[in-house]
Curated annotation (Swiss-Prot):
Biased segments, Basic and acidic residues type: 258-270
Keyword Transport in annotation: no
UniProt similarity note: Belongs to the universal ribosomal protein uL2 family.
InterPro entries linked: NA-bd_OB-fold, Rib_uL2_dom2, Ribosomal_uL2, Ribosomal_uL2_bac/org-type, Ribosomal_uL2_C, Ribosomal_uL2_CS, Ribosomal_uL2_dom3, Ribosomal_uL2_RNA-bd_dom
Organism: Lactobacillus helveticus (strain DPC 4571)
Name by which UniProt lists this protein: Large ribosomal subunit protein uL2
Organism superkingdom: Bacteria
Assembly, per entry: Part of the 50S ribosomal subunit. Forms a bridge to the 30S subunit in the 70S ribosome.
One GO term describing the cellular component: large ribosomal subunit
GO molecular function: rRNA binding; structural constituent of ribosome; transferase activity
Pfam family, any one: Ribosomal_L2
Region listing for Disordered, in residue ranges: 211-278
Gene name tied to this protein: rplB
């Protein structure tokens, strides 16, 4: 992937960048692997806003991704690398030898014509999926399961990867992108390699409208709201917070509060917290 830089023909184009989509080999998705999806604009079934700053955006079809990678001992050919509007990573279209088609996250270096497979004794190469206990220490992995058979939940964004550190009894030690070292059951599966489209984080949207296409609405500061909308609101002109410390929109302390429940069941599986945490 390379970054495409635009000429500053307008204010919106100035500093704007995008992907050149050089890796994309097919523009129309596989119809049998599509599902319709409806957007709720951050509302629940009562119509109340539960997630702020969402709404609008371009209509999209959901691509059904195979996160489980449980089709063992059956080789698949990479037929295409496609764009997926629902995620930052690109996706790869697989054709299995038994006629089944599936999408997977496209790892860095995967090309059309490559062979990928899943199982306990497959080669350690990008795109292959196997249990953590069969992956050598130091290997970069992505799409990691937390429960055997549930499907990959960790490390799925563009450019992300984790590293296998070693085995500790029934668990495998994995260093995540954040720096956190965590125990994961050795029977859980992961995919070899780094997630592709690694320069996605360098893209600059350039204008507000491009953000709206993604379904993201503007975010206002609490200090410019009315007092019935936010604890920081109200006052004459640029008024201070008016409280001992900043508050969330729902009246809770915004700083100094732990963001993770210390009684969470998975707490004992975390060997070292992420970088910057206390």
């Amino acid at each position: 992937m390379a970054i495409k830089i635009y000429k500053p023909t307008t204010n919106g184009r100035r500093h704007m960048t995008s992907s050149d989509f050089a890796e994309i080999t097919k523009t129309k998705p596989e119809k049998t692997l599509l599902e319709s999806q409806s957007h709720t604009a951050g509302r629940n079934s009562y119509g109340h806003i539960t997630v702020r700053h969402r709404g609008g955006g371009h209509k999209q079809k959901y691509r059904i991704i195979d996160f489980k990678r449980n089709k063992d001992n059956t080789k698949a050919v990479v037929k295409a690398i496609e764009y997926d509007p629902n995620r930052t990573a690109n996706i790869a279209l697989l054709h299995y030898t038994d006629g089944i088609k599936a999408y997977i996250l496209a790892p860095k270096g995967l090309k059309v014509g490559d062979i990928v497979e899943s199982g306990d004794s497959v080669d350690i190469k990008p795109g292959n999926a196997l249990a953590l206990k069969n992956i050598p220490s130091g290997t970069s992995i992505h799409n990691i399961e937390l429960k055997p058979g549930k499907g990959g939940q960790l490390v799925r964004s563009a450019g992300a990867s984790a590293q296998v550190l070693g085995v500790d009894g029934d668990y495998t030690l994995v260093r995540l992108q954040s720096g956190e070292v965590r125990k994961i059951l050795s029977s859980c599966r992961a995919t070899i390699g780094v997630v592709g489209n690694e320069q996605h984080s360098l893209i600059k949207l350039g204008k507000a409208g491009r953000k709206r296409w993604l379904g993201k609405r503007p975010q206002s500061r609490g200090s410019v709201m009315n007092p019935n909308d936010h604890p920081h609101g109200g006052g004459e002109g640029k008024a201070p917070v008016g409280r001992p410390q900043p508050m969330t929109p729902w009246g809770k302390k915004a700083r100094g509060i732990k963001t993770r429940d210390t009684k969470k069941a998975s707490e004992k599986l975390i060997i070292r917290r992420r970088k910057g945490s206390k």
